[in-house]
Amino acid sequence: MERFQKIVCHETYKQTYEKLQELEKDREFCGHDMEHFLSVARISYLMVLEKNLDIPKDIIYATAFLHDMGRADQYEKGISHDEAGAILAEEILKDCGYTAAERKIMVDTILKHRDVEEKEDSFAAIFYRADKLSRDCIHCKAR
Protein backbone atom coordinates (compact mmCIF):
# COMPACT_ATOMS: atom_id res chain seq x y z
CA MET A 1 0.00 0.00 0.00
CA GLU A 2 3.07 2.23 -0.25
CA ARG A 3 2.01 3.61 -3.62
CA PHE A 4 -1.46 4.34 -2.28
CA GLN A 5 0.07 6.35 0.57
CA LYS A 6 1.91 8.40 -2.03
CA ILE A 7 -1.44 9.36 -3.57
CA VAL A 8 -2.92 10.86 -0.42
CA CYS A 9 0.38 12.69 0.21
CA HIS A 10 0.65 13.93 -3.39
CA GLU A 11 0.53 17.73 -3.50
CA THR A 12 -1.99 17.89 -6.35
CA TYR A 13 -4.23 15.40 -4.55
CA LYS A 14 -4.11 17.36 -1.30
CA GLN A 15 -4.82 20.68 -3.03
CA THR A 16 -7.69 19.23 -5.06
CA TYR A 17 -9.17 17.53 -2.00
CA GLU A 18 -9.06 20.76 0.01
CA LYS A 19 -10.67 22.66 -2.88
CA LEU A 20 -13.39 20.01 -3.18
CA GLN A 21 -14.17 20.21 0.54
CA GLU A 22 -14.45 23.98 0.32
CA LEU A 23 -16.72 23.79 -2.74
CA GLU A 24 -18.98 21.26 -1.04
CA LYS A 25 -19.10 22.83 2.42
CA ASP A 26 -22.73 23.92 1.95
CA ARG A 27 -23.77 20.90 -0.13
CA GLU A 28 -27.24 19.68 0.85
CA PHE A 29 -26.52 16.06 -0.02
CA CYS A 30 -23.69 13.93 1.32
CA GLY A 31 -20.28 15.04 0.13
CA HIS A 32 -17.26 13.52 -1.50
CA ASP A 33 -14.87 13.21 1.39
CA MET A 34 -12.52 10.70 2.97
CA GLU A 35 -15.44 8.87 4.59
CA HIS A 36 -17.03 8.29 1.18
CA PHE A 37 -13.74 7.30 -0.45
CA LEU A 38 -12.95 4.87 2.37
CA SER A 39 -16.44 3.34 2.24
CA VAL A 40 -16.18 2.77 -1.51
CA ALA A 41 -12.71 1.24 -1.07
CA ARG A 42 -13.82 -1.12 1.69
CA ILE A 43 -16.98 -2.26 -0.08
CA SER A 44 -15.09 -2.76 -3.36
CA TYR A 45 -12.36 -4.71 -1.59
CA LEU A 46 -14.89 -7.01 0.10
CA MET A 47 -16.72 -7.62 -3.18
CA VAL A 48 -13.44 -8.40 -4.97
CA LEU A 49 -12.52 -10.88 -2.21
CA GLU A 50 -15.97 -12.52 -2.34
CA LYS A 51 -15.61 -13.05 -6.09
CA ASN A 52 -12.00 -14.27 -5.77
CA LEU A 53 -10.78 -11.69 -8.27
CA ASP A 54 -7.10 -10.86 -8.61
CA ILE A 55 -7.23 -7.11 -8.08
CA PRO A 56 -4.59 -5.77 -5.69
CA LYS A 57 -5.77 -3.87 -2.64
CA ASP A 58 -3.78 -0.75 -3.52
CA ILE A 59 -5.44 -0.62 -6.97
CA ILE A 60 -8.86 -0.73 -5.31
CA TYR A 61 -8.03 1.90 -2.70
CA ALA A 62 -6.29 4.18 -5.21
CA THR A 63 -9.31 4.08 -7.50
CA ALA A 64 -11.69 4.79 -4.63
CA PHE A 65 -9.69 7.74 -3.35
CA LEU A 66 -9.45 9.27 -6.84
CA HIS A 67 -12.83 8.51 -8.41
CA ASP A 68 -14.67 11.69 -7.33
CA MET A 69 -11.75 14.12 -7.27
CA GLY A 70 -12.91 15.57 -10.60
CA ARG A 71 -15.87 17.12 -8.80
CA ALA A 72 -13.86 20.30 -8.16
CA ASP A 73 -13.46 20.83 -11.93
CA GLN A 74 -17.12 19.93 -12.44
CA TYR A 75 -18.19 22.68 -10.05
CA GLU A 76 -15.71 25.26 -11.35
CA LYS A 77 -15.53 24.48 -15.08
CA GLY A 78 -18.64 22.47 -15.90
CA ILE A 79 -16.62 19.42 -16.94
CA SER A 80 -18.08 15.99 -16.11
CA HIS A 81 -16.42 14.82 -12.92
CA ASP A 82 -15.61 11.37 -14.26
CA GLU A 83 -13.68 12.82 -17.21
CA ALA A 84 -11.94 15.45 -15.07
CA GLY A 85 -11.16 12.80 -12.46
CA ALA A 86 -9.66 10.47 -15.06
CA ILE A 87 -7.26 13.19 -16.24
CA LEU A 88 -6.25 14.03 -12.67
CA ALA A 89 -5.90 10.35 -11.75
CA GLU A 90 -3.59 9.64 -14.71
CA GLU A 91 -1.22 12.40 -13.59
CA ILE A 92 -1.19 11.41 -9.92
CA LEU A 93 -0.99 7.66 -10.54
CA LYS A 94 1.96 8.10 -12.89
CA ASP A 95 3.78 10.19 -10.27
CA CYS A 96 3.10 7.53 -7.64
CA GLY A 97 4.65 4.65 -9.57
CA TYR A 98 1.67 2.83 -11.07
CA THR A 99 2.34 1.08 -14.38
CA ALA A 100 0.60 2.04 -17.62
CA ALA A 101 -1.51 -1.14 -17.42
CA GLU A 102 -2.54 -0.41 -13.83
CA ARG A 103 -3.35 3.20 -14.68
CA LYS A 104 -5.53 2.07 -17.59
CA ILE A 105 -7.60 -0.18 -15.32
CA MET A 106 -8.08 2.57 -12.74
CA VAL A 107 -8.73 5.39 -15.20
CA ASP A 108 -11.24 3.26 -17.16
CA THR A 109 -13.03 2.44 -13.90
CA ILE A 110 -13.16 6.12 -12.93
CA LEU A 111 -14.59 6.97 -16.36
CA LYS A 112 -17.30 4.30 -15.95
CA HIS A 113 -18.17 4.71 -12.27
CA ARG A 114 -21.43 6.57 -12.94
CA ASP A 115 -22.79 4.41 -15.75
CA VAL A 116 -21.27 0.99 -16.22
CA GLU A 117 -22.08 -1.48 -18.98
CA GLU A 118 -19.54 -4.10 -18.03
CA LYS A 119 -19.93 -7.77 -17.21
CA GLU A 120 -20.99 -8.28 -13.60
CA ASP A 121 -17.61 -9.49 -12.32
CA SER A 122 -15.52 -6.73 -13.89
CA PHE A 123 -13.76 -4.28 -11.59
CA ALA A 124 -15.73 -1.40 -13.15
CA ALA A 125 -19.07 -3.12 -12.39
CA ILE A 126 -18.03 -3.98 -8.83
CA PHE A 127 -16.79 -0.45 -8.28
CA TYR A 128 -20.03 1.02 -9.64
CA ARG A 129 -22.07 -1.07 -7.17
CA ALA A 130 -19.74 -0.24 -4.28
CA ASP A 131 -20.05 3.48 -5.00
CA LYS A 132 -23.86 3.21 -4.86
CA LEU A 133 -23.84 0.99 -1.75
CA SER A 134 -21.58 3.44 0.08
CA ARG A 135 -24.41 5.97 0.38
CA ASP A 136 -27.23 5.80 2.92
CA CYS A 137 -29.74 7.46 0.58
CA ILE A 138 -32.76 5.80 2.18
CA HIS A 139 -32.13 7.82 5.36
CA CYS A 140 -31.13 11.03 3.61
CA LYS A 141 -32.22 14.15 5.48
CA ALA A 142 -32.01 16.18 2.26
CA ARG A 143 -34.95 14.30 0.70
Language model features by range: what are they?
Residues M1-R143:
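Metal-dependent phosphohydrolase cores
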